[in-house]
């Protein structure tokens, strides 16, 4: 999966967040956890899009961006999957995570760490 392939999945998550926001009533007493999770999901989504934009300017960020974006997508999807109906979602609407697993594997993370040791942290603008 390259960076432009992440975009449709991030768009799918954005749609799920918006659908969940429309479904919930906004009652802090009854839906505090869900609203909290949605606010962090929205922040994580923005961070993922920001790092992908950074890769366009600095390809040295590609490997860390792949890990970060895969982790964001997986984390948000898992939160939705545990209580999909609470968020007004169906399990079939959630992203398929299989294509992201290589970026989250111990081998990928280890290679990323080794790259940091060998080359230092990639500089960004």
Task: Please name every model-derived segment.
Residues 1-125:
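Flavin-dependent oxidoreductase catalytic core characteristic
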